[in-house]
């Protein structure tokens, strides 16, 4: 029972969604955030390829200039809106002090996104990934990032994931809510699996959405610079600049595998059957379809 208490000790609900306690403490600042019309929001459920799509977008903004992308770490170039860790991290403050055009990272579901983003009609990119691979990646994230309780065994963690008892709540609700928002021409809805399968096609889609002109040279440069191996070895994207007491990559690297289908190495037959049954219940009303392998 104690381990259950320890687990929830780190989190607090905000509008019915489980969230990191440190973030909730300053929630008023997040809700009151003032968007600008030329802000671009990159929204994802955690562990869905946020850093990957962020670096692609940043490269489009910088017209493929790799050196400009390496001038600072990604969490300074694209601040994490709701992130707050006392004096260490403050997404709202970072963004307030930033010149336009700003790129804003968030894991918030649409109903928690500050109202000013909708009022200013900001463009939003939403990237999602199949639930099984997200659950695996989230499990390893719990193990290596400070501020997370012990996730228990993998099957125990999957149970919590299925019930939405993880930061940012239910994956099912998150993706379904954003899928509805994706019907707006101001929201581009992308799948991680599509990026893995045909990166060129998805990069061109992003360039068009951002109203830039695609050239073969630009697309080639983006594809090379944002490949998994390049980003894993790049200190401005691999989070190795963070001290071990915040993110201990000796336990699990931040850039772990970057593949589709790793869930097969973690789900037993019984766990997979249980997950599939629950998944079907949660997603039966939705037209949203995912691929768990490519």
Curated annotation (Swiss-Prot):
One of its GO terms (molecular function) is flavonol 3-sulfotransferase activity. It comes from the Eukaryota. Pfam families: Sulfotransfer_1 (PF00685). Changing residue 145 to E: Substrate specificity constants for estradiol and estrone are reduced. Dramatic 400-fold increase in the ability to sulfonate dopamine. GO terms for biological process: 3'-phosphoadenosine 5'-phosphosulfate metabolic process; estrogen catabolic process; estrogen metabolic process; ethanol catabolic process; positive regulation of fat cell differentiation; steroid metabolic process; sulfation. Liver, intestine and at lower level in the kidney. Changing residue 107 to A: Complete loss of sulfonation activity towards all substrates tested. Keywords: Cytoplasm, Lipid metabolism, Lipid-binding, Steroid-binding, Transferase. Inhibited by estradiol. Substrate binds at residues 105-107. Transmembrane segments: none annotated. It catalyses: estrone + 3'-phosphoadenylyl sulfate = estrone 3-sulfate + adenosine 3',5'-bisphosphate + H(+); (24S)-hydroxycholesterol + 3'-phosphoadenylyl sulfate = (24S)-hydroxycholesterol 3-sulfate + adenosine 3',5'-bisphosphate + H(+); 17beta-estradiol + 3'-phosphoadenylyl sulfate = 17beta-estradiol 3-sulfate + adenosine 3',5'-bisphosphate + H(+); 3beta-hydroxyandrost-5-en-17-one + 3'-phosphoadenylyl sulfate = dehydroepiandrosterone 3-sulfate + adenosine 3',5'-bisphosphate + H(+). Belongs to the sulfotransferase 1 family. PANTHER family: SULFOTRANSFERASE SULT. Sulfotransferase that utilizes 3'-phospho-5'-adenylyl sulfate (PAPS) as sulfonate donor to catalyze the sulfate conjugation of estradiol and estrone. Is a key enzyme in estrogen homeostasis, the sulfation of estrogens leads to their inactivation. Also sulfates dehydroepiandrosterone (DHEA), pregnenolone, (24S)-hydroxycholesterol and xenobiotic compounds like ethinylestradiol, equalenin, diethyl stilbesterol and 1-naphthol at significantly lower efficiency. Does not sulfonate cortisol, testosterone and dopamine. May play a role in gut microbiota-host metabolic interaction. This is Sulfotransferase 1E1. The lineage of its organism: Eukaryota, Metazoa, Chordata, Craniata, Vertebrata. The gene is SULT1E1.
């Amino acid at each position: 029972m104690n381990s259950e208490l320890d687990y929830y000790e780190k989190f607090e609900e905000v509008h019915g969604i489980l969230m990191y306690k440190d973030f909730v403490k300053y929630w008023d600042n997040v809700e009151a955030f003032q968007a600008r019309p030329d802000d671009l929001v990159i929204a994802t459920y955690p562990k869905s390829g946020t850093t990957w799509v962020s670096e692609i977008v940043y490269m489009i903004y910088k017209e493929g200039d790799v050196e400009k992308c390496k001038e600072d770490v990604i969490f300074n170039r694209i601040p994490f809106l709701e992130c707050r860790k006392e004096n260490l991290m403050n997404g709202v403050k970072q963004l307030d002090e930033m010149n336009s055009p700003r790129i804003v990272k968030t894991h918030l579901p649409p109903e928690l996104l500050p109202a000013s983003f909708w009022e200013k009609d900001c463009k939003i990119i939403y990237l999602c990934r199949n639930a099984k691979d997200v659950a695996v990646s989230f499990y390893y994230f719990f193990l290596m990032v400070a501020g997370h309780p012990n996730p228990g065994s993998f099957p125990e963690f999957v149970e919590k994931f299925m019930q939405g008892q993880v930061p940012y709540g239910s994956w099912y609700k998150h993706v379904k809510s954003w899928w509805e928002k994706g019907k707006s021409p101001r929201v581009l809805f992308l799948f991680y699996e599509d990026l893995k399968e045909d990166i060129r096609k998805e990069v061109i889609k992003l360039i068009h959405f951002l109203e830039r002109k695609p050239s073969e040279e630009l697309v080639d440069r983006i594809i090379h610079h944002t490949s998994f191996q390049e980003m894993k070895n790049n200190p401005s994207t691999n989070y190795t600049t963070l001290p071990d007491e915040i993110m201990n990559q000796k336990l699990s690297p931040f850039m772990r595998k970057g593949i589709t289908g790793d869930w097969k190495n973690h789900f037993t037959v019984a766990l997979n059957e249980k997950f599939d049954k629950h998944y079907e219940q949660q997603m039966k009303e939705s037209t949203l379809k995912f691929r768990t392998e490519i």
